[in-house]
A protein has these predicted regions:
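Glycine-rich, flexible loop segments associated with nucleotide phosphate handling
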Residues: 323-327
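Alpha-helical transmembrane segments
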Residues: 330-334
Length: 413
């Protein structure tokens, strides 16, 4: 395959990203502290802390293997002419432009899924199983994979078909039309996800009447939060790990509590967690997140429309017959490093939002200690990293390290 300047730029950018990931991974392992921080005395015992250190090392090593595998697959497919070979195969079916594009992009997606499946199986049934987290049966795992593939085929295929048609026929402003369409679909999906998507994978039940529901509803009322529903999700079907999150907008918005969270925390702690989630809404973090996602879509489509019409992009990947669908596929490889930069910005914003929601919850409930205790228990039960390296936090973390959050709540941060 012939090379050009863009070939070397893209190759070096992706190799550089891999090296940065490797350095961050190693630094994160070196940052592990053999002694338990004082704030967590009485939360972890010695055996639990040893287990945390082993789990962090195991997951870090697995991440390094996964990153190496991903890079090897990309380089092998790219340098052996895979993008052009697949293009010639789908063109030989003599279908229309949209169908050919969907077959090409769908083939890439399916191939990536197949090659990533062994790693996902190993992570679920070896690493998570070894440390007592996994509750997923092979049947549940297989069902989740099939559902995910079908959702990707139906929803992803429909969106891709529209994007391909718009970019093909929309002229110079096509990216704007595609951006508008994708933005509307994003908002619709955020609205419909609680009713249509989440129930496909998990059973959602209303929180039963009792002290916890009364306290949560009273807290929501005090904070002026029109809570449509408090749902308990059967997260224990798949893992012992716990979480809570806010989902939906408008009339579909709800707070979702994992059943493992409800089981392991006091009423005060759960009310504080709920207040934290309400804080994201009251402080308009949800709106900012949606706006940020829409801006990212716009940046992607603007750059994509500009670059997929450049012959040098196709030459860099050995694609002999330019097309919009092949252009989008190879542009994704170029966009990866840029996406990492945008991800760093989004991560910094997200961590600020978490601190702000913590402050909101502490002030609104007068229970900073309860939220701090909830964070400590979550970290212990999930074996979360108490002291990740700063570079690792900057590159990957949407939440601040739990130790920093606890210290901020205790007035020590």
């Amino acid at each position: 395959m012939k090379t050009n300047a863009l070939f070397w730029i893209i190759l070096c950018a992706n190799a550089g990203m891999y090296l940065l990931d490797t350095v961050a991974n190693r630094l994160n392992l070196r940052a592990l502290k053999p002694e338990l921080p004082g704030e967590f005395e009485g939360v972890y015992d010695r055996e639990e802390y040893r287990r945390f250190l082993e789990y962090t090392a195991a997951t870090a090593n697995f991440e390094r293997v996964g990153a190496t595998w991903d890079l090897a697959v990309l380089l092998g497919f790219w340098l052996l002419g895979g993008y052009d070979l697949l293009d010639r195969v789908v063109r030989s079916a003599h279908m229309g432009f949209i169908a050919t594009g969907l077959l090409y992009l769908g083939g890439l997606y399916f191939g990536r899924w197949v090659l990533g499946l062994p790693l996902e199986i190993y992570e679920t049934f070896r690493i998570e199983e070894r440390f007592g987290f996994n509750k997923t049966t092979p049947g549940t795992f297989a069902g989740d994979q099939v559902k995910s593939l079908l959702l990707s085929a139906v929803l992803g295929g429909a969106v891709l078909a529209l994007v391909l048609a718009i970019l093909q026929h929309g002229g110079p402003a096509a990216w704007l039309y595609a951006w508008g369409m994708a933005s509307v679909l994003l908002i619709v999906m955020v609205y419909l996800a609680p009713a249509l998507i989440l129930p496909l994978f998990n059973k959602m039940t209303p929180l039963e009447d009792g002290e916890l529901r009364r306290e949560i509803m009273a807290c929501a009322e005090r904070l002026g939060f029109p809570l449509a529903e408090i749902s308990v999700m059967d997260g224990s079907r798949r893992s012992t790990k716990a979480n809570a999150f806010f989902t939906g907008i408008g009339g579909t918005k709800r707070v979702v509590l994992f059943d493992t969270l409800v089981k392991n925390h006091t009423t005060e702690e759960l009310v504080a967690v709920l207040a934290h989630e309400i804080g994201h809404f009251k402080l308009r973090h949800i709106v900012q997140h949606i706006v940020g996602a829409i801006l990212n879509i716009g940046i992607f489509l603007f750059l994509a429309q500009w670059l997929i019409r450049w012959p040098g992009l196709y030459a860099a990947f050995g694609v002999r017959q330019p097309s919009i669908y092949a252009g989008l596929a190879v542009f994704l490889v170029l966009y990866g490093p840029l996406s990492r930069v945008l991800g760093i910005v989004r991560g910094a914003q997200s961590r600020r939002h978490e601190f702000a929601a913590d402050r909101f919850a502490a002030e609104a409930t007068g229970l900073p200690h309860a939220l701090g205790e909830a964070l400590k228990k979550l970290s212990r039960n999930n074996l979360g990293n108490l002291s990740p390296h700063r570079l690792h936090v900057v590159l990957y973390h949407s939440h601040p390290p739990v130790l920093e959050r606890v210290r901020a709540l205790e007035g020590k941060g």
